Amino acid sequence: MATVKLIDEGAASPRVKAVFDDIKATKKIERVPNFWRALAVHPEHLELVWSRAKAIMKPGALDLVIKEMLALAVSITNSCKYCINSHTAAAQKLGMTTEQHGELLAVVGLYNQMNKLADGFQVEPDLLPNVD
């Protein structure tokens, strides 16, 4: 259960309604997801987070399905049940297959374990990226 009362689309202020309308148009969805309705209790924060999400999650060097799969990987690592479901649905809508989903989960599980082991052993980095 949410810790704030979700803002209903019909009761939204004009400022919030503008963001809600943009979310629905951009995501091509019929209703505003609960996450955005929760953020709407603070309209300025809603605008800032939506603006950032819209800028980052638009087509770019990474395909949209890859971006959603990355968002899903982070959500799994952060144990965000809402986010896991939301990003799984979004990635599936963009074409993520069951096989890709399973492979993503395997990679996330493997590297969560390996990262914890590297941190636990306090291993010094010896393979460094190129910086041009």
PLM ranges: what are they?
Residues 1-132:
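Hydrophobic alpha-helical segments
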